[in-house]
């Protein structure tokens, strides 16, 4: 299933009301169909210069069994590129750790924090809840009414 048909893309796009499965933004015209459970593409090193190489996809997958429509979620470009080949739980951790690390590494953010311009609340340590999780809860509560 390397390439989705237009009909399949339309189905994936509407899985969560036309929104990114992760951040919940309205999907723009250009969006990605993400493998929730990664397929992990195989890579090979290609020589580009005297001592330089770049990694390119071979077109093969380590987990081709995950390449199915049920495993595809709609994602905005930013979320999908950041998630890359991570699992949902790993992506959740990447977001929390990335935020904490950004504050710790940035002198301007630490300064803003000292001057009260930036407040890191306990919510920053809370679990990241993705749109698809909220959407499913909302959908279930509507069905219960």
Regions of interest found by a model, annotated:
Residues 39-45:
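Compact nucleic-acid interaction/catalytic patches
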Residues 32-38, 74:
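Histidine-centered catalytic micro-motifs used for acid/base chemistry in nuclease
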Residues 1-7, 11, 15, 24-28, ...:
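Extended charged
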């Amino acid at each position: 299933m390397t390439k989705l048909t237009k009909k399949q893309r339309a189905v994936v796009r509407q899985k969560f009301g036309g929104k990114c499965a992760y951040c919940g933004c309205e999907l723009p015209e250009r969006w990605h169909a993400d493998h929730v459970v990664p397929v992990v593409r195989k890579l090979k090193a290609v020589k580009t210069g005297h001592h330089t190489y770049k990694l390119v996809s071979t077109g093969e997958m380590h987990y081709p069994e995950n390449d199915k429509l049920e495993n595809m979620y709609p994602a905005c470009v930013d979320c999908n590129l950041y998630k890359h080949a991570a699992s949902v739980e790993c992506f959740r951790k990447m977001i929390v750790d990335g935020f904490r690390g950004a504050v710790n590494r940035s002198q301007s953010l630490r300064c803003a924090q000292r001057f009260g311009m930036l407040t890191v609340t306990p919510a920053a340590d809370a679990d990241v809840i993705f749109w698809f999780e909220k959407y499913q809860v909302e959908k279930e509560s509507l069905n219960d009414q």
